[in-house]
Amino acid sequence: MKYIDRKGNITIEENGQDKLLKHLYNDRGGRLCLKLLVRPFVSKAAGLFLNTGISAKLVPGFVKRNRIDLSLYQKQEFTSYNDFFTRKIKPQERPVAEEDKVLISPCDGKAIVCRIADDSRFYIKDTEYTVEQLLRNKKLARKYLGGYALILRLTVDDYHRYCYVADGEKSKNVVLPGVFHTVNPAANDALPIYKENAREYTLLKTEKFGTILMMEVGAMMVGKITNHKKGSGPVKKGEEKGYFEFGGSTVIMLLQHGKVRLDYDLIENSENDYETIVRMGERIGEQKLSKRTGKNHRREPEAQ
């Protein structure tokens, strides 16, 4: 994978999770393992184990392998693996860009920006989507034509809590249950497993950025999504929205046409096939003012 941080430093690497997923999705042996792993009883058993005290013994090795600095977090001792995985960071380590016109990142992760068109296809964990397939809602998908999809991929070493990106009024959460597909040996290929994973979204109506769709996608096995507020109501920029339990996961934002000017580096990096490393609370864009104001009207490049 090719990553670039906001200062322009490039990293080319493949972590253990990337290697495992490539094996599971792209060769016959891996797909046979995948057929077993996605069975409900296996996923349930794994989830139960990760909440036990015994699972806490896995934490020290994980911390060492992934070079995680526990001093950044509110506690350093954990009762289970999931207690560790959902650990809270110290607030000062993720300051929120406070200007009203500034849009912030909802989470830590590796970001890709894509323009949304009728023929747009987005890749998440080697699976191809249209916006309509992602939302299972044709009418809602059309609301974001011409805008941006911001896909933030979390790996196991990332902070797995996420926040609201602006002040606004949220809708009720929409839950799309997951459907696990198995392999197709005759075609020697895997059916699109990841896009059928459980996912959840809410619409955030804002004064400055239009209506932002915020979606969370669970991981392949036990990546449970926990959102704190299920119903509609007001929320604040930087307020914690929820968290993922164990598993690399994905946060997706859909932005309406003409409402947000994303930062140039995010778009340019995406055009050059780099994922941009971002942190929760940091600036990723700003309100796009209309032509009538005579401000902030620099032409935006197209993302692929």
Question: In which residue ranges do the predicted regions lie?
Answer:
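Contiguous, well-folded functional domains in the mature portion of proteins
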Residues: 1-304
